[in-house]
Amino acid sequence: RFFLFTEHGNYVDGQTTLFELTYNPKGGPLEGRSDLVGIVYMYNLYHWEMGDVQLKQEGDLWKGTFEMPENCAFIAFKFQSTFTLQPDSTDNNNDNGFMFIPQNSAGDYLPGRYLAWGVFRMPSLGSETGNYFSGNYKEISNEAAMMWTDQETKHYPQYGRHFFGTMNQF
């Protein structure tokens, strides 16, 4: 199986850009399905956002486009059989996630990337990431989550007021 997303447009500061994604369900839980939807989880300037990606089948592959804000520091995708809160089948890469740390138009990583990487993988924090992982997911430890928070503090101290509430949960 593979998953790929590529830029399909250009950033305009503070705006969005269009990305194209390609998903191959072969060998996964969604192989052979006739209708799929993609769910995108974005951490945009210290706020979680979710959206859907309408997918169209092209041979064995599924393709779609989505808009990503310029300030998006973390992005994850999950694919499912229907657009419901309780789909009968999902693919999140066996709880390993389809997760990425994007760069802005200048090639720089953005504030929030470390915090999002840690918080997303610790759903017990109630990080507004929905039901990305299965009930069998083993989340990262408090120590690992704190390490990611420490990295955020080290690299982006000027944004501390945005993530102070998250730090109090450890």
Outline where the language-model segments fall.
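Glycan-association/targeting regions that enable binding to alpha-glucans and other polysaccharides
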Residues: R1-F170
